[in-house]
């Protein structure tokens, strides 16, 4: 039974970045490639721990090393991305990034044979069989377990903001869904997903985690797929809300934002601040607005008494936290808008070509 521990939470502000990508052929269409890229040969020297795969044979995950100093995030991310692109190219593959690949049709794609994923397919059935999603996960180290749970509770309001900024998955199974992030809607059809309820402290979270494993709801703690969670193995707060990104600058803007939020909330925790009561129903409404509208979303405020546009929220957050990256992301064309424009102007070929990472 794989469960984490309070002792894992020992260090503040370390970073880890996990990105899920699509393995594609020369035409940019998803294709099975994990037998070559994950199991077929040794990993590149730059990423000695190698790459992992996800549910489908056309998906692959790249993780940075533990980033001790947040100022090294740019180099760490560029190193692992370049290594993945080169590793794939050696076997004739390309790498593409989006929350959902617009050319992916799940009935035509192969599932991975790894026992963990086969067990999930058997347990969850249809929602997992069609789960061709790809996301971005950001870890920030926290040096106290109760603090980590307190911070995760507070980050719940920010998850829809991150999702709206990142939304770049309008196409699903060959058609336009009308959503900015169809990935988020597809993924939250799985159990133990979405924005979680608040937990009183680490003991409460660990009791829940243990109960879910002991009662057979999940195989291990890694199957709690919430938008934000204390990671009891790594000793981090993990934010899992964003769609995967082609542009590393966008990924790094989200990393900067999540890191700044964790540092800010850690200081508030130390000051003894009482967290506001956030109803999950209102958080779910905010997430729906992000899914549907992306950059055009507005959100119910924390007190439930007003709404704030994404642009206003971004401006407030940048001024409050002293960051700029998400302002640039908001000011630019959104990922979902870009995909729709490219498909209209150049068709599916142009869109698939645009999603591929540069060699």
From Swiss-Prot:
Keywords, comma-separated and alphabetical: ATP-binding, Ligase, Nucleotide-binding
EC number(s) given by UniProt: 6.3.2.2
Keyword Transmembrane listed: no
Keyword Ligase tagged: yes
Top-level division of the source organism's lineage: Archaea
Broadest EC class assigned to this enzyme: ligase
Enzymatic reactions: L-cysteine + L-glutamate + ATP = gamma-L-glutamyl-L-cysteine + ADP + phosphate + H(+)
GO molecular function: ATP binding; glutamate-cysteine ligase activity
InterPro entries: GCL_type2/YbdK_subfam, GCS2, Gln_synth/guanido_kin_cat_dom, YbdK
Any one of the GO BP annotations: modified amino acid biosynthetic process
Family: Belongs to the glutamate--cysteine ligase type 2 family. YbdK subfamily.
Function recorded in the entry: Catalyzes the synthesis of gamma-glutamylcysteine (gamma-GC), the main low-molecular-weight thiol compound instead of glutathione in halophilic archaea.
PANTHER family for this protein: GLUTAMATE--CYSTEINE LIGASE 2-RELATED (PTHR36510:SF1)
HAMAP family associated with the record: Glu_cys_ligase_2
Protein name (record): Glutamate--cysteine ligase
Organism: Halorubrum lacusprofundi (strain ATCC 49239 / DSM 5036 / JCM 8891 / ACAM 34)
Gene this chain is encoded by: gshA
């Amino acid at each position: 039974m794989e469960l984490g521990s309070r002792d894992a939470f020992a260090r503040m502000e370390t970073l880890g970045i996990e990105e899920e990508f699509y393995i594609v052929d020369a035409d940019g269409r998803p294709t099975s490639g994990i037998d070559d890229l994950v199991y077929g040969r040794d990993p590149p020297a730059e990423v000695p721990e190698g790459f992992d795969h996800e549910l489908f044979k056309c998906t692959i995950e790249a993780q940075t090393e533990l980033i001790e100093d947040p100022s090294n995030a740019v180099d760490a991310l560029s190193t692992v991305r370049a290594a993945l692109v080169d590793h794939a190219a050696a076997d004739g593959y390309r790498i593409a990034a989006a929350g959902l690949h617009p050319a992916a049709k799940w009935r035509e794609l192969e599932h991975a044979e790894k026992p963990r994923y086969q067990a999930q397919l058997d347990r969850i059935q249809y929602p997992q069989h069609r789960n061709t999603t790809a996301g971005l996960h950001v870890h920030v180290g926290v040096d106290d377990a109760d603090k980590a749970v307190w911070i995760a509770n507070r980050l719940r309001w920010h998850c829809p903001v991150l999702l709206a900024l990142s939304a770049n998955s309008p196409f699903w199974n060959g058609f336009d869904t009308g959503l900015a992030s169809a990935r988020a809607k597809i993924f939250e059809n799985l159990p133990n997903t979405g924005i979680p309820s608040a937990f009183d402290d680490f003991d409460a979270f660990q009791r829940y985690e243990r109960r879910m494993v002991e009662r057979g709801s999940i195989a291990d703690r890694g199957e709690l797929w919430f938008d934000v969670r204390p990671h009891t193995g790594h000793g981090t707060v993990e934010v899992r809300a964003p769609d995967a990104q082609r542009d590393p600058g966008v990924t790094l803007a989200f990393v900067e934002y999540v890191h700044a939020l964790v540092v800010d909330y850690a200081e508030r925790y130390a000051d003894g601040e009482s967290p506001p009561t956030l109803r999950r129903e209102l958080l779910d409404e905010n997430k729906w607005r992000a899914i549907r509208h992306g950059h055009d979303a507005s959100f119910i405020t924390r007190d439930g008494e007003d709404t704030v546009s994404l642009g206003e929220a971004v401006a407030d957050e940048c001024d409050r936290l002293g960051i700029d990256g998400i302002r640039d992301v908001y000011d630019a064309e959104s990922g979902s808008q870009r995909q729709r424009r490219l498909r209209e102007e150049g068709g599916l070929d142009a869109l698939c070509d645009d999603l591929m990472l540069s060699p």
